[in-house]
Amino acid sequence: MSKDLEVAGRYANALFQVAQDKDLVDVFSEELTELKAALKANEDFVKLLENPTFTTEQKKNLASAVFEKINPTLRDFIYLLIDRSREDYLSVIADVYQKRVNDLNGVADADVYSVVPLSEQELTALSRVFATKMNKTKLNIQNHIDKSLLGGVKVVIGTRIYDDSLKTKLKDMERQIKA
């Protein structure tokens, strides 16, 4: 595990614990998702926030103006990150926090690779089947197009790969013929 992920994980876990204690897990989840999207969309703000020439107070004032509508506890958490010069970890903290929320709710992320975009019905069917296999209540599926598969699908959930693509079947057949 990289040091950045380890540091972000400690902060995310602490925030998650506070959220559980205050019954704000879902509120923080939504606000962190919005916050991460805002940071991604506004790189200039991120550069200002991470600029070492700004004082801690200037950074807090900037954050206060931008994040005025978020939960006060979450805003205080952001101030804590600024105080400790960890504001550059905010996006990673949001990711780790969301993973904790997903684990709590029995949700997993899945990447589905196919030759053509899958319909909502197909994605729902895949979600139902693989959620059961993974002992989860739901899968958040991201459909990716990969023309090299030739047909079928490849499903990646965490470290598990379920490959039912034509490409893999042909490679397996080739190995059997050569053996």
From Swiss-Prot:
PANTHER family: ATP SYNTHASE DELTA CHAIN (PTHR11910). F(1)F(0) ATP synthase produces ATP from ADP in the presence of a proton or sodium gradient. F-type ATPases consist of two structural domains, F(1) containing the extramembraneous catalytic core and F(0) containing the membrane proton channel, linked together by a central stalk and a peripheral stalk. During catalysis, ATP synthesis in the catalytic domain of F(1) is coupled via a rotary mechanism of the central stalk subunits to proton translocation. This protein is part of the stalk that links CF(0) to CF(1). It either transmits conformational changes from CF(0) to CF(1) or is implicated in proton conduction. It is a peripheral membrane protein. GO terms for molecular function: proton-transporting ATP synthase activity, rotational mechanism. This is ATP synthase subunit delta. The keyword Endoplasmic reticulum does not apply. It is found in: Cell membrane. Belongs to the ATPase delta chain family. Pfam families: OSCP. Keywords: ATP synthesis, Cell membrane, CF(1), Hydrogen ion transport, Ion transport, Membrane, Transport. Gene3D superfamilies: N-terminal domain of the delta subunit of the F1F0-ATP synthase. One of its GO terms (cellular component) is proton-transporting ATP synthase complex. Its main location: membrane. The keyword Kinase does not apply. F-type ATPases have 2 components, F(1) - the catalytic core - and F(0) - the membrane proton channel. F(1) has five subunits: alpha(3), beta(3), gamma(1), delta(1), epsilon(1). F(0) has three main subunits: a(1), b(2) and c(10-14). The alpha and beta chains form an alternating ring which encloses part of the gamma chain. F(1) is attached to F(0) by a central stalk formed by the gamma and epsilon chains, while a peripheral stalk is formed by the delta and b chains.
